[in-house]
């Protein structure tokens, strides 16, 4: 094994320090260090690039491989401190020359950020004067070809709520023979396993042994006048030279391309004349020169000289890059936007949504809860969670991993749920009616430009009222998501176009010019170029179909329209052409996730061996040069669905589908069993034998074919850098669809609101922004594993849809974004946070933090209720009076002009909130109520708690504390159940005054019953002949006004937390408080969905 010396240089900028909610005033300092695995012989050199700005209390300093930031003093709440410390870490290491790229891709570069503090006297020379109070470790996922260019906000732990913003740039800068010795760990054996770790310095090899191999020895020629080289050593030298030169040239190309993009996209960047390099020609030239040399000494020297020249060019470019972009504010903003978008998109995985009619909210929902559990188990049995790719810079404590990410289920209750069947209309009147129906589904401003079609193949099981109980039913309506719809649409399209195999691209920008392929900013000229398919003949009818798909650029948004012409029926052609957008958008949208990104760098596949690529004559593509590339698979997916099914070509498919759907009445019993098992199987593929068997012999073969197609698409544009046409909307973020290192001009505003949350973007209102590929910066094996896992999920035919398929999520604005206040808003949005039993005002501290971070620039004021924290065992009337006094006094003392009032309650605090709403003194504020977020609130009491252990504990606590509130929770505070506190409270008006009623519960919570937190009927209550009727009446009293109010939006959540096996988890306490203290749950919940309720 031949080892070479590699050097990767990291530029780490500590931009700002934010005091989110620190408890102590004093001096703070951040210490940074870089670590890599000890099995790799390495040395780390640390330095400061240059001192900038104020020195604050003490300047930054370097201590061996440790760098200390400026020492700064924190005195005020929400204080921001500008650090602008630029730290340089040079990591020199020995790598196997056969696995340079693989090793660098897989290596864990760990950046440690330690927060130190002192409130006493401090001397800069004494490092021990400051104590370590919190630490975070960032894992940097480095690519030798693309480098690393990213920005993250690193939040320290709960007890030291503060954030430091960090920008990281990294590049490979050198590859050559080993020039220094490296400490190499000594292998331990069973004899010395307890001995302290020891290192010995590696021996510096000679140049010849590096170039020709460790076994190389000089051989004299037969005439004795010169030396000769054996073929094996010569081939080793050529391979060694090529591998290192190709890697260096690719690193140069990637850094050069990113540099060009930055300087062009950001006007304020210093413009430099950067020398263009044809890396393919340069590599060929270097290899040809080497092959001309016969003398071994001269050959080794020439190879060494070539490597030295390339390293010099790369280092010079890296120096210029740092000089221009270091501490550049506009670039930092763009990188922050990119990271935030990727992070929110990652959180949106395993966040499911189900749509129900509003009437279903009051029906018996027990089967839904069991369905959630079974879905969760099925998901965990797949590789989906374990294959979730990391972010370019990840911190498992902040971003979550397999062991910490929760699975969340959302139940929406809408006025109408689209459950139409496929219907190809034959006249304009039918299509006009369909357009009218679709228009009614266009709800919010954010979705008004996106047309939708009825979801294909959705099935309905009607709810038939039970004679025994008005709130239970024999059947349940199940809304099927786009996963199952996708496959039926693919079947139809595949049969419509059996010979539709290739699509030539006329896009002039499919070259490797990284300036265009990196840029995320949509180029309207490029987007408007046409894509035309060759004429293909349909085997069944002989009908020639011409697809003229073009991008119609009307500012933003842009939509793809397909015009279809046939040579059989002119009138039908006119009808289909006229309504092609309406009929096709759903099909196109449901296919788009397969093509995961529109634009990518024209760089090589990071795991492709450069030697093999050159031998195959693919150097052109490897370096991203312009090439003629077959994109048939890519276009077959993106454009085949733009073709509307026509009567002439798809009559058989339509009839089969309608025949299958006509069997619903015969299959009701099977359907009921499916729902009870937690799944709802859509139309089976066997029902479409006539259409499937034309291409595939089995379902397995069909799914395998789709998976291969999906993987091939991703590998094609990863390797060739094809510029797929980009489609943007006004709410589209440019970064996710572009390479992660490509900045662009991004405009955003936290003031965007959902005028009616009840009409949220659903699975049917799909958009091209849903093809955001947050994981495309990951190594190819991780991408393939994740795509495989997503295919496994599709095979499960899970109901509903995932938020990762929704184009617009709740948060699009990075934390700490500075925005102008919206002067049109009068007054502040007051959010009152109320703790639960035996709690205090700090219980909802994290909830407050993530709302504030997620809505920067918003006029929000928080009242963290503390009036009841000394006595939460009192009766509810007493606690209600205290909270009401606290709210009114807070508004009066601070002279607040309140435009909105929202309440967030935990556990018992939710009942105090509801009680406040009924008081006459609060009547003035009822018309200002906005959102009620209930976190594990016992709205129906604890009457049917399934945990005997918890019931016993609460009974003991009630007796011990003589607690009125605990007695009232059990509905035993009066002999007449209809005179109990909870029943009388349910009769009083309250919840329907809110715009949003959000109920969060968990099946893992044993303290508050799941059905009580979500205000649902439970099986035990149905069987209880004494109190069950009272329970049903309470549910009806609470929900009926909410459902009757058109302005009130009801949403329920079920949270399945990833909890450790502890006593708290066993008794259900861990899940009960996870809604308060789990940073990962709160960020996922608010960033993906819940922030919109507070906008």
UniProtKB/Swiss-Prot annotation:
Protein's UniProt keywords contain Coiled coil: yes
Entry's SUPFAM superfamilies? Answer: alpha/beta-Hydrolases (SSF53474)
Q: Which domain of life is it from?
A: Eukaryota
**Keywords per UniProt:** Coiled coil
The question of whether Coiled coil is a record keyword is answered with: yes
The parts of the chain that form a coiled coil are 269-295, 646-670
Q: Where is this region: Disordered?
A: 643-673
Tell me which InterPro entries the record gives.
AB_hydrolase_fold, DUF3657, DUF676_lipase-like, Lipase-like
Q: Which family does it belong to?
A: Belongs to the FAM135 family.
Protein's name according to its UniProt entry: Protein FAM135A
Q: Which organism is it from?
A: Pongo abelii (Sumatran orangutan)
Q: Name the gene.
A: FAM135A
């Amino acid at each position: 094994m031949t080892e070479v010396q590699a050097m990767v240089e990291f530029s780490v900028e500590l931009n700002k320090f934010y005091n989110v909610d620190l408890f102590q005033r004093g001096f703070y300092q951040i210490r940074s260090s870089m670590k890599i695995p000890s099995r790799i012989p390495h040395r780390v050199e640390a330095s400061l690039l240059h001192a900038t700005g104020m020195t604050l209390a003490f300047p930054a300093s370097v201590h061996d491989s440790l760098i200390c930031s400026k020492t700064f003093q924190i005195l005020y709440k929400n204080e921001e401190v500008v650090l602008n410390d630029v730290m340089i870490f040079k990591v020199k290491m020995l790598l196997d020359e056969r696995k340079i790229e693989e090793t660098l891709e897989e290596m864990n570069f760990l950046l440690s950020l330690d927060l130190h503090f002192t409130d006493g006297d401090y001397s800069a020379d004494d490092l021990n004067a400051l104590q370590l109070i919190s630490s975070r470790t960032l894992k940097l996922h480095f690519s030798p070809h693309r480098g690393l260019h990213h920005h993250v906000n690193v939040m320290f732990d709960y007890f030291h709520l503060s954030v430091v913003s960090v920008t990281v740039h990294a590049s490979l800068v050198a590859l050559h023979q080993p020039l220094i010795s490296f400490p190499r760990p000594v292998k331990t054996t069973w004899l010395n396993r307890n001995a302290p770790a020891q290192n010995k310095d590696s021996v510096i090899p000679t140049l010849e042994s590096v170039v020709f191999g460790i076994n190389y020895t000089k051989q004299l020629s037969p005439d004795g006048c010169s030396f000769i080289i054996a073929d094996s050593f010569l081939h080793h030298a050529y391979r060694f030279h090529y591998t290192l030169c190709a890697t260096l040239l690719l690193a140069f190309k990637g850094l050069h391309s990113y540099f060009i993009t930055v300087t062009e996209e950001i006007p304020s960047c210093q413009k430099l004349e950067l020398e263009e390099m044809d890396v393919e020609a340069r590599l060929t030239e270097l290899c040809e020169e080497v092959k001309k040399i016969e003398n071994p000494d001269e050959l080794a020297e020439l190879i060494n000289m070539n490597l030295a020249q390339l390293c010099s060019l790369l280092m010079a470019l890296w120096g210029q890059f740092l000089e221009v972009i270091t501490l550049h504010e506009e670039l930092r903003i763009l990188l922050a936007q990119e990271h935030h978008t990727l992070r929110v998109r990652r959180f949106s995985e395993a966040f499911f949504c189900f749509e129900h009619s509003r009437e279903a909210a009051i029906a018996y929902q027990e089967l839904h809860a069991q369905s959630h559990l079974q879905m969760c188990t099925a998901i965990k049995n797949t590789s989906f969670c374990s294959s979730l790719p990391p972010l370019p810079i990840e911190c498992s404590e902040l971003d979550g991993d397999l062991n910490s990410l929760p699975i969340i289920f959302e139940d929406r209750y809408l006025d109408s749920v689209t459950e139409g069947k496929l219907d190809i209309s034959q006249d304009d009147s039918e299509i006009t009616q369909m357009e009218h129906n679709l228009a009614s589904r266009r709800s919010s401003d954010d979705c008004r430009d996106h047309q939708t079609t009825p979801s294909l193949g959705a099935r309905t099981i009607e709810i038939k009222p039970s004679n025994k109980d008005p709130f239970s039913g024999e059947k349940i309506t199940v809304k099927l998501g786009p996963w199952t719809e996708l496959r039926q649409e693919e079947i139809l399209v595949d049969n419509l176009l059996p010979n539709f195999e290739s699509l030539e691209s006329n896009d002039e920008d499919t070259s490797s010019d990284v300036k265009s392929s990196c840029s995320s900013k949509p180029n309207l000229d490029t987007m408007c170029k046409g894509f035309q398919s060759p004429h293909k003949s349909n085997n069944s009818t002989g009908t020639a179909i011409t697809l003229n798909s073009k991008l119609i650029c009307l500012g933003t948004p842009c939509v793809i329209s397909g015009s279809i012409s046939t040579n059989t029926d002119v009138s039908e052609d006119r009808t289909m052409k006229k309504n092609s957008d309406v009929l096709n958008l759903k099909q196109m949208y449901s296919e788009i996730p397969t093509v995961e990104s529109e634009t990518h760098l024209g760089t090589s596949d990071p795991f492709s061996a450069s030697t093999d690529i050159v031998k195959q004559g693919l150097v052109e593509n490897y370096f991203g040069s312009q090439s003629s590339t077959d994109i048939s698979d890519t276009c077959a997916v993106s454009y085949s669905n733009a073709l509307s099914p026509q009567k002439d070509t798809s009559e058989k498919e339509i009839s089969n589908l309608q025949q299958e759907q006509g069997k619903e009445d015969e299959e009701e019993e099977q359907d009921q069993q499916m729902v009870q098992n937690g799944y709802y199987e859509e139309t089976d593929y066997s029902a479409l034998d006539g259409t499937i068997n034309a291409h595939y012999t089995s379902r397995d073969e069909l799914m395998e074919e789709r998976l291969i197609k999906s993987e091939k698409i991703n590998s094609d544009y990863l390797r060739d850098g094809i510029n797929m046409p980009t489609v943007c909307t006004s709410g589209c973020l440019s970064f996710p669809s572009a390479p992660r290192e490509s900045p662009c001009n991004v405009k955003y505003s936290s003031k965007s609101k959902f005028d009616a949350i009840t009409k949220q973007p659903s699975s049917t209102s799909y958009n091209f922004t849903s093809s955001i590929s947050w994981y495309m910066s990951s190594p190819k094996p991780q991408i393939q594993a994740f795509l495989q896992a997503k295919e496994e999920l599709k095979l499960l035919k899970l109901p509903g849809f995932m938020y990762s398929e929704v184009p617009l999520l709740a948060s699009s604005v990075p934390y700490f974004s500075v925005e102008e206040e919206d002067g049109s808003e009068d007054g502040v949005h007051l959010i009152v946070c109320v703790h639960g039993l035996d709690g205090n005002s700090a219980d909802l501290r994290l909830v407050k933090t993530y709302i504030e971070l997620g809505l920067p620039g918003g006029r929000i004021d928080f009242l963290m209720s503390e009036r009841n924290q000394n006595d939460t065992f009192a009766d509810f009337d007493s606690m209600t009076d205290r909270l009401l006094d606290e709210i009114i006094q807070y508004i009066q003392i601070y002279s607040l002009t309140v435009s909105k009032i929202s309440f967030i309650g935990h556990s018992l605090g939710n009942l105090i909130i509801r009680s406040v709403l009924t008081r006459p003194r609060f009547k003035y504020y009822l018309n200002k109520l906005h959102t009620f977020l209930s976190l594990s609130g016992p709205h129906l009491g604890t009457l049917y708690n399934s945990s005997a252990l918890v019931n016993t504990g609460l009974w003991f606590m009630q007796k011990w504390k003589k607690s009125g509130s605990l007695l009232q929770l059990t509905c035993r505070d009066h002999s007449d159940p209809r005179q109990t506190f909870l029943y009388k409270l349910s009769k009083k008006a309250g919840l329907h005054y809110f715009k949003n009623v959000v109920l969060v519960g968990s099946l893992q919570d044993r303290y508050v019953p799941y059905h009580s937190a979500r205000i649902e009927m439970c099986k035990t209550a149905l069987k209880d002949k004494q109190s069950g009727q009272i329970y049903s009446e309470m549910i009806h009293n609470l929900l009926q006004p909410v459902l009757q109010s058109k302005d009130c939006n009801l949403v329920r959540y079920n949270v399945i937390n990833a909890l450790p096996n502890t006593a708290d988890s066993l008794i259900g306490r861990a899940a009960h408080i996870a809604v308060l203290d789990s940073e990962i749950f709160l960020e996922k919940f608010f960033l993906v969905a819940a922030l919109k309720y507070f906008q």
